[in-house]
Amino acid sequence: SARGYAWCGALTALLTGQSYVTSAEMAKQHGAFPGYYRNRDHMLRVIRNHRRAAWNAEKSEYEGLTVKPTGINAAYLPDDLVQRARKVWDKALELGEVHGFRNAQVSVIAPTGTIGLLMDCDTTGIEPDFALVKFKKLAGGGYFKIINNSVPPALSRLGYSESEVREIITHATGHRTLKGAPYINH
């Protein structure tokens, strides 16, 4: 129903908008996510477009979109809910322009498998990664194995040398476990 869409849109706007506010606050303290500055203009365009959807902007106001997103339909919602959703996106944009964001993505609606891979992320939201090594199905058939991107820097931080990290990663990718990996204290 139109009312159901409006409520889902407003609640999702609040959830995602507040998550980006928090992400910007985290970036102020700990720095933006790796690759943020390389993608800053695109990231801020996405945030501006989300903000416009919260304000139910006209199609001509969106940047780089050919299809107008469904904005929040205030006719079916309590005014305070609409205002909170709009204010949180105003704040997300304001803080993001100054500090960047700690997270590239903060929420997603499935399917997620390839989306995260294309965005250079292990996960596309707040959920933890489900495996140390994952299989990615290829469109043309077959699979390839990928290791969680946080593993190499974690091993380096633990004091392993570059060559040790490479050997550990090779073992983990091949065996899908750290068990039996060289240099690991089992």
Task: Show where each model-derived region lies.
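Long, C-terminal-biased catalytic regions of enzyme "large/alpha" subunits
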Residues: 1-186
